[in-house]
Amino acid sequence: MPHATTSKPLTFYVDTPSVRVFQEFAGESLGKLDEYEAWDVITALCQAASLASQYEQATIDIHETIEALGDDIGFSDHCKKCLEALHGFPASQVNALMVGILAVAFDV
């Protein structure tokens, strides 16, 4: 019986509003994240949403987020490109985006 592997790439093939929003912001070439990168993106998005709420900003600031996280996360180059593409993403849509990423990551 085959077992699941953690190195399977995440492909954003599910057609949900949050996945469409992700693809719109991040572009087609950034539509794949491995599972570790997905968690890094979600961690950064949580921090970004928290900072946006704290400073009453309508959009997330990825540069401020990465600075706030410091060396806690060693972002891969692919992950950095993905996050950079999400700079300025509407803070009000971050939760939906994270749900979409999790839904694809865990095939729910």
Map each language-model feature to its residues.
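Short amphipathic alpha-helical interaction elements located at domain edges
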Residues: 1-108
